[in-house]
């Protein structure tokens, strides 16, 4: 694909109009249209700004892409996953999980995954299904998977969570404060240290990272992908060690380590 086709493709993926891009760059929408038709090319300053607006690297805009594959944001229907998780929770009397599922669906209503039209609830349901597929049928784990983002992303309070105190504590452990460039290392160091002391929180966090690694190619910029790789390399060995040292999670630890390290290796080679 040409530079113009790349610009158009990334703009449409971000659900931006030519007018919106033009406003961000302080140019006319006709200029953006001419770039996408390959009649003209943006100058260097415009190209850098354009990459920032579209949240991609400059090379992603200018390099000709020979092979275009059809991709999809979601593999399973989230409503089908919800039915599966609720049915399993009923069968195994996971009462906290049953309440957590409905609470999470309502809390995340109207939210989408980054750079997609996929409802956000797809993510926690994916985590719950991942745990169940590894034969981890624990009320605290399934409920924790469903609720792990509601405090951070939905402006909810711990006291409002319809679950027992152990699950509330797991959610608290998995929630980290907002960071800045100045305090990010300090906050993340304390965050992962806290997680590594709790086997259930460690397991959920590893499942969460598996899901985030599989979706970050369409949800994150190249710089954010790079940061995610570095963060995973730095902190996950310690969290994974906690999962491995918990006998009932031994099989899950093998699968999770394989998935995380395989995904990391793929991204590193492609980066």
For each predicted feature, which ranges?
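Short coil turns linking two alpha-helices in DNA-binding domains
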Residues: 17, 28-31, 43, 57
